[in-house]
């Protein structure tokens, strides 16, 4: 994948996360979302955080959550965990639901 393709796909991930948080905040959630360049910080009511950031040199998207740190690479049409193959949005949904204490589903 070229650098341009990576940036287009990775920025789409950040935009999808932002859209989901905005929609969740219209419902029962209270998630603070801060973007600083290519880093998104989601802060939940209990003070816990999830950080999603882009890693252009490695062409990856990373998640840092209470569950740990996870690296995702674009493979066969989806961002997949480099160790387990878990899809990015499914994993982020699980981590955010755990930390928020309420269900939240992230999609592309």
Swiss-Prot record:
Keywords: Iron, Metal-binding. SMART domains: Frataxin_Cyay. It comes from the Bacteria. GO terms for biological process: iron-sulfur cluster assembly. GO terms for cellular component: cytosol. One of its GO terms (molecular function) is ferric iron binding. InterPro entries: CyaY, Frataxin/CyaY, Frataxin/CyaY_sf, Frataxin_CS. Involved in iron-sulfur (Fe-S) cluster assembly. May act as a regulator of Fe-S biogenesis. Belongs to the frataxin family. HAMAP family: CyaY. This is Iron-sulfur cluster assembly protein CyaY.
């Amino acid at each position: 994948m070229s650098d341009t393709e990576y940036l287009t796909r990775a920025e789409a991930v950040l935009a999808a996360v932002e859209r989901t948080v905005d929609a969740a905040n219209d419902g029962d959630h209270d998630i603070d979302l801060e973007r600083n360049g290519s880093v998104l910080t989601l802060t939940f009511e209990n003070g816990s955080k999830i950080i999603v950031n882009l890693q252009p040199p490695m062409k990856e998207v990373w998640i840092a959550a209470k569950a740990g740190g996870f690296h995702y690479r674009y493979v066969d049409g989806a961002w997949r965990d480099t160790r387990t193959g878990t899809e990015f949005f499914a994993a982020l949904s699980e981590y955010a639901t755990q930390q928020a204490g309420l269900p939240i589903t992230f999609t592309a």
